[in-house]
């Protein structure tokens, strides 16, 4: 599915080595948790896996293609939910119209279903939402793209206790045998019930 092969990464400014000769394989049909303190390299690994960062050495292979190539056929089958992001002040319907075409397997029906897990609906304007609400909408969109690889960086940050419970049900409902989900967290108890493996 996706393999990390002898990966090394160093931040240029600080010269801090984050990963050195790191290898790992992720299988389909599994939810993986990347557990570690802040600054341990969890986010860096997710960005390397998505091709948004370039390793000093080694490579990440997704469907037998190096993610550094950023090919459309690769990008349409992976989705990264960063810890911090901005959404435009437009209606959710407009946002979906603008962005769903990049993901051939996007399902509006799935989007509605996932929003319901968070007690939200389609008739909302993104500019009027709190950060926690924006996160719920963006995660719902991410899962509704039906990509085979979903990367999530600290997705429960900013969610209250009911929101974290909703998140666990949301992830469980979106899993399938051909999907791999990788979640970084420093609070494993928030998501331990949905994880197949903790790394």
Model-predicted regions and their roles:
Residues 50:
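Helix-to-loop junction immediately C-terminal to a conserved catalytic motif
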Residues 164-177:
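Helical segment within the ABC ATPase nucleotide-binding domain
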